[in-house]
Amino acid sequence: MWDHVFIDIWQKDTFKFQSFGAVHRADHNSFFFFLILSTLTTLRAQQPRLVEVGNGYSQTSVNTTVFRNNSLVTQGDEQYISYYDGDGYLVLGKRKLDSDQWTLKRTQYKGNVKDAHNIISMMLDGEGYLHLSFDHHGHKLNYCRSTAPYTLELGDKESMTDVDEGNVTYPEFYPLNGGDLLFVYRSGSSGRGNLVMNHYSVKEKKWNRVQDVLIDGEDQRNAYWQLYVDEQGTIHLSWVWRETWYVETNHDLCYARSYDNGVTWYKANGKKYDLPIRYNNAEYACRIPQNSELINQTSMSADTSGNPYIATYWRDPDSEVPQYRIVWHDGQMWHNRQVSNRHTPFSLKGGGTKMIPIARP
């Protein structure tokens, strides 16, 4: 028996969204990775195609969680992938975009694949070095980079800044203009954590701390964020607050943006933040009470005018059914709209990884 999970890869002009799908067999500890490739143009759309990659671990969602940034990276005419195999080893792969043949490398590193939090995040810098961070759920920073540009050989683990790297969860890389990289992670625990931000300079070939505490949970809560860097280089950041380890304490949707690679932050109306951002000075894109089945860690984007769009779901007070929503700013004010018509109720309760009946958008 096979379960199918697929995500399209679309390319439209200069915009690219890339991810991968999997086919899972319930009686085996691994699954086949596949790519679904598709190109959308103004003239015609092509049918997607499947590209088999290899066997990956499947007893948890560690290879498929939505907060991996990124597990699939394209630079020039080459594409890179990362995943855990059936034995928990970190595997890297690359291929030419016009080829279905992957070159795979089982690295020297393993992860605790039984915990779906312990994802792999990777990114290529402007010189072609591959940067990876992996296997975190309140652990010391695990970070390494390739030994040479465009190779699958990884060097030893190393520190980035050697400051506040002992309790890391949700590592994420983002490309910046000029080939530099942004790296964010949570320092602390669920309900008691802060958002930390680093910047990698290709010129200096080193990491620098941008924000020791960008979003401060004040030892009372933490932010579960989603981040997007638009074509102009503006960093868009949105998040929900969580008061405790329990998912039902998720509440509200907040927003901030930066035009200078994370140094200075603003609200959507242009007002400058006094950092760090806390509960009392955050901009609230939408007020959503606790116990609303509000999901954390979803997706966001921005239009060509730099206006943010956030995809999420929650339940209205007079309903038992969570609905998908789009929350956006039009340059003047915030809006939100229900974009689904679901009929099946469910509840988000308790701590840990949940078996959720609908996907994070």
Regions inferred by a protein language model and the residue ranges of each:
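Bacterial Sec-dependent N-terminal signal peptides
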Residues: 1-47
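Extracellular, repeat-based ectodomains that mediate carbohydrate processing or recognition
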Residues: 46-361
